[in-house]
Amino acid sequence: MKNLGFGMMRLPVLSGPTDFDYAQLNRMVDAFLDAGYTYFDTSFVYHNGKSEEATRKALVERHPRESFTVATKFPTFMLIPEEKIEETFQRQLDNLGVDYIDYYLLHNIQNVYYDGYDGKGGIVKTTHLFDHAKKWKEEGKIRHLGISFHSSAKLLDRVLTEHPEIEFVQIALNPIDWDSELVQAGPCYEVIRRHGRKVVIMEAVKGGGLAKLPENAEAVLKAVHPDWSIASWSVRFCLEKEDVIAVLSGMSTPEQVLDNTKTANSAEPLTDEEKKALAEAMRLYRESAPIPQSEIERYKGLVYHGVPVSAILQAWSICQIQPDPGFSDDNNYLKNAIAEAEHVDFRKGLEKQTVVTADGTDITELVEKAVAWLTAHSF
């Protein structure tokens, strides 16, 4: 199965985020389709709300409807009142220029929007969002209903239990997030499969963060496969996962399209030697962060407002070595972890808690710094 997906969130532009370079984008879309791939993923909010329109112009208006599948998402986090939900969905159909959407997702389902800060029900429940989506499916306006998810495996298990209508879940998954304490990509993936649902993988190269590694980490990978791009290791890691509809890549250049389609066309399950090399490269990557993973291990067992301190520091530290630290997927998880643990709204401030290690070292200031940064950059 050809399961590479084109993420329409980092499209080529000429000046600003909505001034698309259609000459280049059209070539990229054509090359992707020519390689045998059909899944295009957009959203109501990408590129300042213009990604769906760009998808229409570069894809829908230029290719037969049966030659591609399109996915887009309802902007849960915009807190749209229920009386505006139907209007918003119709705008998405119009933006895309289609009569139906192949894969429709409720965007960014997480603790705050699902349960609310108080645990009594977030925007998803108060606006009956799933009921609207089920109606659209019954009307034939969407073919498959799913969610994108940014929270704990525990919450995901409950959401899938409470909503059997969910057919697939989109999660951040890559070699770093797989065993991230906060992102929990591995546990979330296993929850989805245990429920018999399908998976869409986003952030396969962690927003470009795994396309270039520290020199010593790259050397480990190049020693095994000198001809593989660094990014392709992460893509291969994702492509070998089972029950996956699409592995998304937010591509910006024709070269990235060529590299990703070439990788997907030739991808085989990683060998034991390749897995060992990738694991070592990721270890070196974590060690290059401001707080090396070996140091973070010292903080296991410590908790700050119900969240493991090691998870907080790991997420903050990894964000700092991303190409765009303020837009890393890790940023979106802390507020949900705190809300899930204590039903506290981090936006109103957190009560003072002291964090002291077993040897008596006070690391409260370090933890507060990490929490403040992750809070400021949450979305």
Which sequence ranges carry the predicted segments?
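N-terminal binding-site loop/beta-alpha segment at the start of enzyme catalytic domains
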Residues: 1-68, 132, 363-379
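Glycine/proline-rich, positively charged
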Residues: 12, 20-23, 30, 79-183, ...
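Structured C-terminal cap/extension of enzyme domains
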Residues: 33, 37-38, 187-379
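Short catalytic-loop micro-motif centered on adjacent basic/acidic residues
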Residues: 39-46, 143-147, 246-248
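Hydrophobic residues in well-ordered beta-strands that form the structural core
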Residues: 41-42, 72, 201
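Short beta->alpha linker loops
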Residues: 46, 50, 150-151, 252
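Short, electropositive alpha-helical surface patch
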Residues: 54-67, 157-169, 259-267
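Structural motif corresponding to the early beta-alpha repeats
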Residues: 62-82, 107-110
